Each structure stands twice: as C-alpha cells, then as structure tokens.
Amino acid sequence: MSTVESALTRRIMGIETEYGLTFVDGDSKKLRPDEIARRMFRPIVEKYSSSNIFIPNGSRLYLDVGSHPEYATAECDNLTQLINFEKAGDVIADRMAVDAEESLAKEDIAGQVYLFKNNVDSVGNSYGCHENYLVGRSMPLKALGKRLMPFLITRQLICGAGRIHHPNPLDKGESFPLGYCISQRSDHVWEGVSSATTRSRPIINTRDEPHADSHSYRRLHVIVGDANMAEPSIALKVGSTLLVLEMIEADFGLPSLELANDIASIREISRDATGSTLLSLKDGTTMTALQIQQVVFEHASKWLEQRPEPEFSGTSNTEMARVLDLWGRMLKAIESGDFSEVDTEIDWVIKKKLIDRFIQRGNLGLDDPKLAQVDLTYHDIRPGRGLFSVLQSRGMIKRWTTDEAILAAVDTAPDTTRAHLRGRILKAADTLGVPVTVDWMRHKVNRPEPQSVELGDPFSAVNSEVDQLIEYMTVHAESYRS
C-alpha cells in the first residue's frame, strides 16, 4: 500500500537536448549541416577517436543521427541543479560552434554557425528534448503512463515553447491551417506509450534502460516535451512533473482523467491558448485542458502541504513552492486571458507577445517571413545574437538560477550524485592523459592492466573503488606518456 513516504522526493533526473544546426556564410563555400556538425566535433574526434563522449562535468556529448549535436545532462537530483546543467549544455555547444567558425575562417570559409534549441526545422523535421526520471520498479510502466498521460498531454499549456505552424503543401493529410501553436512537439508524436523514438514517436518511451539497479528502478523517458529557453519554463515543466510523479507514487488520490484520444487531444490543445477546447474522456465525460491542469494543480497544492522534505538533497519544499506559485499564476492567466503576470517567464507566452507586437507594428500576416525569423531566432543559443539572449540580458525574461551557477556546471559535475564520481575519473584521466572507457555506470582504465569500476547507485557520490582507480591512474601516469 502506497503512503506519503513512498514518494521519491529525491529523484535522479536528466534532460537530453538535440540542437538544430545551420551555417550562414558570405560568398564563400556553402556547407551542409552535417559538414558543420562534423567540424564542431572534429577536435573531440581527434582527441578521443569518437564523437560520443562523456565530459568532465559528468554529462554526455555526442553527434546524433544526421546533423544534430546532442547533450545529455549528468544525473541531477534537484530542480535548480538540473536547470544549471541543462543550460550548461547551451554554453558548451555554443563554444564548440565558435571554435568551428574560427577553424573554418583559417580555411577562408567565412560564416556563422547557428545552433537552435527548438524542436522543428523549416521543413517540418522534428528533433527532441527528452526528460528522464528515475521511478520505482514496483509500478508497471503502462500503469504509470496511464496515470501520467492526461497531465503530460495538457502540460504544454503551462510550459510550451510556442511556434508558428505553417501547413506543408506537400502533405496531403495536413488538416491544420496557418496558426500559432503553444507547443513545438505536439504535432510530432503518434502514440501514447511505446518503445519507438523516431519512426512512431510516443509521449512516453518504454525502452527499459534504468542505468541503475534494474530490480529496484526503471527510467521514465518522456519525449513529448518542448526544448525551453526560459529558465522558469524549464522549472515549471520539470517541477510540475516531479510533483505529479510523487502524487502517483504516494497514491495521493489524483483522479483518473484518461482521455479518449491522446493524439487528437494533444494537437487540439496546442492550437488553443485559452485551454477551453472540450476533450472527451474515456469515462464518457468531457473536460477542457485547462480544467485538467487545474485539477492536477489543486491536488499538487495539497500534496505540498504534507510532502516529506528530502533528507539529503533533492528538490526542497521551498523550491516546489516556487513551482506551484508559477503554475498557479499561469493557470489564472490562461483562464482570464491576461498574461501580464507570466509574460516574462513562459516561452510560448513570451514569443506570442513578440509576434503580436511585430504584427501590430508592421501590419503583417502570420505567414510573413519576418515572423518566421522571429520564431526561429528566439531559439538561437548564441549570447548577444539570439533573440532570447538579448531579451534576458535586458531583464525582459526572468531568471530561476544565475550565470555563475551555470558556468560552474560547465566544468564541474553535480556533487550529490554518481556524476560526481564520473567527473572525478574524467578529470583525472584528462590531466594524466589516461585513455578511459566510460558510460553511465561503467568506468574502465585499459592499461597497463585493465581496471574497472561499476557504479550502480546513481544516488551515491562517494565510492572507495573510484578513489583506488584514480590512485591507480596516478601511480601509472608515466606509462601513459611513453
């Protein structure tokens, strides 16, 4: 029987971000995105003989299928920590882009690399921002998905990234006209719960890779979310999901709100900023997306009143109160139609305000190329060039964390999880010039004699075997230089 204590208030989590990529040149050689991506990763390949590596902050950096650089955060166990490491990925990716520009300039190829933290390119291809949450093995994933699905489908209302939807004239099945959508990802999922990730993207992926004790835990892989730019949007996306997971684990009385058609509903919600479209539930009743979110929010507010404070690390009740405050303000804004209380915190609201302003000033239609440019450049991660960056630097977008904390996360792994141990190994290996083989759980030194450590507990930041492995590398440092 579930109790309040059954909820994981300290939970391992992470975010994987795929970046869109293009190269804008002058009158020199035109380079394809895949060529630019390889140029970005060239120094990594030259050093490590691979484009798929773990880096000293404990995170994973790799070149995904096609031309999408991807960054997966190290294991984090509290909300602000996760935001710091997610944003650190933007810094790391942009530094790689700058290095690529400088390398190309030496070959008389002038131009700028653009990395976009969005989810849809100009021809309708989608790439992801995936969330990972460690959950107990005791609850079957399909049962968990059934309880979680109504929240995830309607969550776009409170934290979507927003975009202008342009109908594809080549798609004969296209049924939606030109319009503003609150989510970028909603049109690109096709199932509720499935093991697929690309061919038939689900809302929740069931691939069983816990990267922990598989008898105790599983990894909930959510692939429906948008890539967010504003820190408060990330906080609300992840923080609200943490609260819902905790309520499900504690059997806190969250009602069943199963939708009759998940995929039709997610697309309809994306095109209704009022959240007022009636959705059919499996029990024969109807509710709006806003009403579903309000029900979940009311339960989350009551949950926080008795939520156990995490004992070691984890997301504190104080921080969860910040999440609830923003969640409540956002729901009130949707209900009233007055978004002035959240128009510096929620991406789709910020972007829609910008687009509406351009429309009014220039008497533009929604299909005007200038608006498509605004839509895209909001997601440019280059400081001082991207529209989001400019707005944030002017104080027009609120912060959840600080630049100092983000920059610290660029070089140093989280100190409360297994990532701390991985970071120590990688920093020692880098300093000593030791070739190591690393993944989420296994860490191996290949010579002079193979030595390996398996870190099965993602919650543990202390391990004597890691101390011994680093000592082994130090003792044999000379042999690596010969």
Swiss-Prot record:
Its top-level enzyme class, in one word, is: ligase
The UniProt subunit note reads as follows: Interacts with the C-terminal half of the prokaryotic ubiquitin-like protein Pup.
List its EC numbers: 6.3.1.19
Name the NCBIfam families on file: pupylate_PafA
Family of the protein in this entry: Belongs to the Pup ligase/Pup deamidase family. Pup-conjugating enzyme subfamily.
Q: What does this protein do?
A: Catalyzes the covalent attachment of the prokaryotic ubiquitin-like protein modifier Pup to the proteasomal substrate proteins, thereby targeting them for proteasomal degradation. This tagging system is termed pupylation. The ligation reaction involves the side-chain carboxylate of the C-terminal glutamate of Pup and the side-chain amino group of a substrate lysine.
Residues reported to bind Mg(2+): E16, Y62, E70
Gene of this entry: pafA
Keyword Nucleotide-binding: yes or no?
yes
Q: In which pathway does it act?
A: Protein degradation; proteasomal Pup-dependent pathway; Protein modification; protein pupylation
Pfam families xref list: Pup_ligase
Catalytic activity line of the entry: ATP + [prokaryotic ubiquitin-like protein]-L-glutamate + [protein]-L-lysine = ADP + phosphate + N(6)-([prokaryotic ubiquitin-like protein]-gamma-L-glutamyl)-[protein]-L-lysine
Q: Which residues form the active site?
A: D64
Outcome recorded upon mutating W440A: Abolishes pupylation
Binding residues annotated for ATP, in chain numbering: R60, T73, W440
UniProt keyword terms in alphabetical order: ATP-binding, Ligase, Magnesium, Metal-binding, Nucleotide-binding, Ubl conjugation pathway
One GO BP annotation here?
proteasomal protein catabolic process
Q: Name any one GO molecular function.
A: ATP binding
Q: Give the miscellaneous note.
A: The reaction mechanism probably proceeds via the activation of Pup by phosphorylation of its C-terminal glutamate, which is then subject to nucleophilic attack by the substrate lysine, resulting in an isopeptide bond and the release of phosphate as a good leaving group.
Question: By what name is this protein known?
Answer: Pup--protein ligase
